[in-house]
Amino acid sequence: MRSGLISFNWDDIDSFSEEQISYYLYLEGKSIKVISKIRNIEEAVVQKHVINGKIKYRILSLSKNCSELLDNIASSVKQEKLTLLSTMENERKEELLKFINENYASMTSKHKETAIWIIGELKDKNQKSILIKAAVNKSVNVRRMAVSAIGKIKDKSFESTLLRVLDDENDQVIVYAIKALIKNEIKSAKEKIIKIKEKTNKEYIKNACEEYLKIVNE
């Protein structure tokens, strides 16, 4: 059975959760009442299963392919995005990351932001080249998302990229870079951070610099 990018086989029912069983029956067109009788559980329980299923799988059910999936993720709220990624099967994640890798260059800025966010949330080190390019993109939001993703991945091989980003013209991007340096435990930026702290009159930048310097000096 398939509904959008949701696919399941009843032969695998032993691996399904109680919630999945109810939701999959619902996808087949069965009513709450019918599912309740089939499963011998209360309608209120079935209703809860279906509601949770809709929350978890709505984006997948609306998407016929990875292109539509990325588009639907881009237009969803953050919590729904997080729920999707936390419940998505590894095979589907790999397909989505493969699509991003092959199509990133032709994406709009909005979709690039979403693609980079996904890379960061899934902590995919295989997309390093995309993140390095994104860190110097003309779009401030793309650069900010790229640096944030680098911080989540925690890979010291991004050192040169983060050091370069400290010269960015946007203050938010710089702060994200400082936070990423902290998360990646990169201590080679001390001199640049000191200069940034001395030049800025913005408290949130000074605070980020102080946090970094405190860790470096420990």
Which residues make up each language-model segment?
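Structural detector for internal amphipathic alpha-helices that build alpha-solenoid repeat scaffolds
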Residues: Q20-Y24, K37-I38, K48-Y57, D71, ...
